[in-house]
Amino acid sequence: KIDTALSNLNAINMLNTKYIILQKDQMPLVNAHACGYAWNVNDVKLVPNADAEITELATIDPHKTLVIQNKYWDEKYNNALSSLDTNFKIEITNFSPNEISYKYSSSAPQIVAFSEVYYPEWEMQIDGKEQPIMKANYVIRAAYLPAGNHDIKMHFVPRIYNKAKPITL
């Protein structure tokens, strides 16, 4: 019964919650439905706004489908939806509070979800070239990744802090 309940908790699954503590004196439950730190999808539901995005979340399997607002989507990403690479591989090579690096390989372009909270101040580079990050499923990051073997670097650029840094009292 608990496994069925966990499979229906999209938010904790797409945020890669691997363990759930129900009572402090018991072993944590292993969540076999956690999506992982990054995964490719072959279906995207485009919606006009955040309210529609939240509504659609109840209808999807986050392992296969992302909900993305129209303003984040570019038509050139459509080719990635017809070519789900079952041999797609991605691994984290560096993880720190302000920077995450990955290596990935794919035989075709992919739409990839990342189990990291979306903030506009995060930027992404693929092999040193800027690439947009999309907000998906209301809270996580997603990106279009080209085919091949590539390095990804996501880093946090605190614009307000950097603007205020030269100001001293």
Per-region residue spans from a language model:
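Extracytoplasmic
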Residues: 1-85, 107, 127
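Active-site-proximal, structured, solvent-exposed surfaces of multi-pass membrane proteins
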Residues: 6, 63-169
